[in-house]
Regions:
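Glycine-/small-residue-rich beta-strand-loop submotif within the FAD-binding core of flavoenzymes
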Residues: 1-2, 196
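Short low-complexity stretches enriched in small and charged residues
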Residues: 12-15, 104-108, 170-178
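FAD cofactor-binding and catalytic pocket of flavoenzymes
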Residues: 41-155, 159, 190, 202-205, ...
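N-terminal start-of-chain detector that recognizes signal peptides
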Residues: 19, 28-31, 95-99, 110-113, ...
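Short, functionally important structural connectors and interaction interfaces within domains
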Residues: 36, 40, 132, 186-188, ...
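Generic structural signal for hydrophobic core residues of well-folded globular domains
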Residues: 28, 128-130, 172
Length: 211
């Protein structure tokens, strides 16, 4: 509204998520803090991570899925299954997908087909770690618009997990396996933009998450 307010306190807690917390600090530039509060390292907004994620659906037209407990299974069986010793990630139930959810991903598909698919599918979520990179970051334009700059990394291990999960679904009786590897739009797990550490030259926060 254009008015300035002054709030005095011993402590302030900034807890606005990985994107907005970084954006608030980047917007706080002043003569005293030319790069924004807590940004003497220049790392505010950098090292944005979000997880590598794939939605996978096993489909069998002759087996109806009547589950009532939609989020009861999680597997780490392939976590250390890489010959290179690289963590592959985690598999968990996605929850029971419904026709309207499939419609969002495949708007051209007829509703009756999506309903049949939803009633005869087993749905899992594959999650692997992405790695911190200063090229993956949150920035704020001069006009105040928040931008996310992101390029997927560590996909080799994630793709190995996808192959293992696909084989598993085939073995347990799903002749058709569909998958969708998610991109930046699946960002509910974002983190990393205010990195903590013991060296203020290489971190934004200390080991107690204080700036």
């Amino acid at each position: 509204d254009g008015e300035k307010y002054e709030i005095i306190a011993n402590y302030f807690i900034l807890s606005a998520g990985a994107a907005n917390s970084a954006a608030l600090l980047l917007k706080s530039k002043s003569e005293k803090f030319p790069h924004g509060l807590a940004n003497s390292s220049g790392l505010v907004g950098k090292n944005w991570m979000v997880h590598n994620a794939t939605f996978m659906v096993g489909f069998n037209p002759f087996r109806r899925n009547k589950t009532k407990f939609q989020k009861t299974l999680m597997l780490n069986d392939w976590y250390w299954d890489s010959p290179q010793g690289i963590p592959l990630g985690n598999i968990q139930m996605l929850g029971k997908l419904q026709a309207a959810m499939f419609k969002g991903a495949r708007p051209w598909a007829p509703n009756w087909a999506l309903k049949f698919l939803a009633e005869h599918s087993f749905d899992i979520y594959l999650e692997s770690e992405d790695l911190p990179s200063q090229e993956n970051k949150v920035t704020v334009d001069e006009d105040g618009v928040i931008r996310i700059h992101w390029k997927a990394n560590n996909m080799k291990s994630h793709n190995q997990l996808v192959k293992s999960a696909r084989r598993m679904l085939h073995r347990v009786g799903f002749p058709i396996v569909l998958k969708e590897t998610m991109g930046i739009e699946t960002n509910s797990h974002m983190c990393g933009t205010l990195v903590a550490g013991n060296d203020p030259r290489k971190s934004v926060l200390d080991s107690y998450c204080k700036a």
